[in-house]
Amino acid sequence: MTDADLIKHLWTHKTQDHPSWSDEDLMIERGEGVYIWNRKGRRLFDAYAGLAVVNVGHGRTEIADAVREQVAKLAYYPTTRQFSNPPAAQLAARLAELTPGDLKYTLFAVSGSEANERSMQIARMYWLKLGRPRKYKVISLTHGYNGATIGTLAICGQPDMVRAYEPFAWQGFRKVAVPYSLWERGAGTDEDLVRRCADGLTDAIREEEAETVAAVILEPCLSAGGCIIPPLGWLERVRDICDELDVLMIADEVITGFGRTGKWFGVEHEQVVPDLMSVAKGITSGYIPLSASIARAKLADAFPENSLEENVHPNTYCGHPVACAAALANLAIIERENLVKNAQTMGARLHAAIEARVCDYPIVGEVRSRGLMLALDFADPGQPGQPLDSRLVASLNTRALNKGYIAVAKDSVLRLARPLCITASEVDELAHLVGETVHELQDEVTRSARSRAAVA
């Protein structure tokens, strides 16, 4: 069978069309470092690290060796019914060392969506264990994205992603404004913006009645929402509000965790310790699916003998020994090669290099970044204060492919999330490619505006 015949049976998430690229062209066969190759041998710069997941880069033989060794020794046994396995126990201990504060107890799962589901379940069960069953509601952020299950879609702050699934069977979810968006910013300083949104969160909890709110869940930086980077001070205010009103704080670190923002975890930019932390993606760099919910001691203490068997249900693959072995090898690479620091250094270099190339283009409203999360937000030159037509921005997906790199363009934003192992020369290469792509788009917008003016 040809590749085309095989692909007919694969139900992919086709969110963009690439007119000049066939499905066979987009079948990726191998990867090394920041690059991937399709079946025809075409090299592409993976400027989105798969889905912001391949933190250590492609082709790491150390992880493959760890997986091979573990499969030969013990390919599978779950962490349920008091059973465990060495890789799961070792990884839980390692996470207790890496995570801030007293986040010391880990419940493993498979995907980021599931980790957030688990975190919400633990939050609800915690209050139930304390004899406060009315505390079941969860507050999330507009523009936020916390997963693709029905439960996590219920807290999703992006209406176009959830409309088809409404109404939700689960009740008790509310969204509040996130303190950053180029198009919704309004007047005032960053401090004013944080204050307004913090007041909005406080008001929402009080309107719902604090005795009915279990948790607030938020991403330190909102990736799928457009790489929104709230001003410093926001996480600290959320922590204070949660403490004041007796509500748990859940940090969704599925994307921001394990070095992506230039710190091991996104909350560390403000020295904040959440009550629960959801992690995935960078825990194994995507080599094998794995996720986790990590809880503070006070939550674990509420469960008999720190056991979650009752009501917080395990799944078949929790604590999978092969996935945990991959994670241990992955974390060793991140630490040994100082990739967290590299994310900070190379992220700053890329931001400066891209900004220097595009800052004079009228269509560029803003370049923003934290570590190796970066976004270009595009503005409509003909309508001040308005984003560029999303169809034009979406064309950047194919424009980037034609230039030889992969990025994600949606709504008004082009997002980049490179592997943490990126080098200075690779940063410069990517900045050049992005600059050329934006130049092409600017030319098209300028020509279109001139054509309309000539007709008028």
Q: Which residues are covered by each model-predicted region?
A:
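Conserved N-terminal phosphate-binding loop of PLP-dependent enzymes in the Aspartate aminotransferase
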Residues: 1-456
